[in-house]
Structures are given as structure tokens and as C-alpha cells.
């Protein structure tokens, strides 16, 4: 009986210690403040439709993203690749083939000051993208914390995941577009 009574007292003490305030305590006040500032500055500019296209000899890539004010996201990706081969001593390209990551998708987005790696010293402005393909594939279209650079009335710039420019960034342009290929 004494053990049972002692256990009840310990459990009640733990419950009272965990619930001593109705106000939640922020774990990282600096990250919270920077996240709020990031959203005040850029979230309204993010809302809308953006597109990015990159065409090279061996690949063609198009992506369109629509960011909604409620934190939802819809998008489309078209990606094709081909190989350079030598036939009878002549270099040629194979036919274009669709990459499996092509398709339409939907999900969520948010801006946050954080460290995707979980280390305080690597915190930065991030664009968090979580999206599944509309045809219910086993893999996701996005599950990524991209380093966010900026958004303006005309340009949205963040670190590329699948395809990127020479500097490691992708610069989406505002507006609706269709792939040129």
C-alpha cells in the first residue's frame, strides 16, 4: 500500500510540475522572432503562381508552384532527360524521356527560421515544402527545407533541390506559364 501511495504522489507531482502555467513557453525565442519577421516580410509576396524553366542539352525542366495564403501549395513539374551516345562514330542524342518526378502535386508550405540539420549554428531562413503527387505515388514530390533567399513582386529565389542554376539557386518568375517543350 505504501508503494502505491508513493507512486500516486510522484505522478501527481509530475502532473503539477508539467502544468504549472497555461502559457506555453517558447523553446527558442530567437527562432520564433526571426520566423515571425520572415513571414511578415515575405509571406504576402509568396502568395500566387510562380514558374521556373531550365533547358540544357541533356535535360529540360519546368516547374510551376502556386502558394495559397492558407499555407497550401499546388504544383506541376515536367522533367525530361536524354543521353548522348555514339553510333557508328557519330555522337547523337537519344529521344527525350520523362523523369519519374514529373506530374502534378499538392501539399503545404511555410517560411521558418530553422536548422533542418538540427544544429543551432546552421539556422537560416527556410522554405518548407511538403507535397504529394496527385496520383498517390509511393514517394513525395517535396519533403524539403530549402534555404530561402527572397521573394519580390517578380522573383522567388530559393536553393534548388532537383535542378538548380550554376550558383545553386532557382529563381522562379511570377505568373502562369506552360512548358516550352
Regions found by a protein language model. Give the residues of each.
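Structural signal for glycine-centered tight turns and loop->strand junctions in beta-sheet-rich domains
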Residues: 69-73, 154
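Short, low-complexity, Pro/Ser/Thr/Gly-rich segments in the mature regions of secreted, periplasmic
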Residues: 168-181
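Contiguous, well-ordered beta-strand patches that form the walls/edges
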Residues: 55-60, 78-157, 164
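Short, conserved catalytic or interaction motifs in soluble domains
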Residues: 21
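Sec-dependent signal peptide recognition
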Residues: 2-10
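N-terminal helix-cap/turn-to-beta initiation motif at the start of protein domains
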Residues: 29-51, 66
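C-terminal motif of bacterial Sec signal peptides marking the signal peptidase cleavage site
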Residues: 15-18
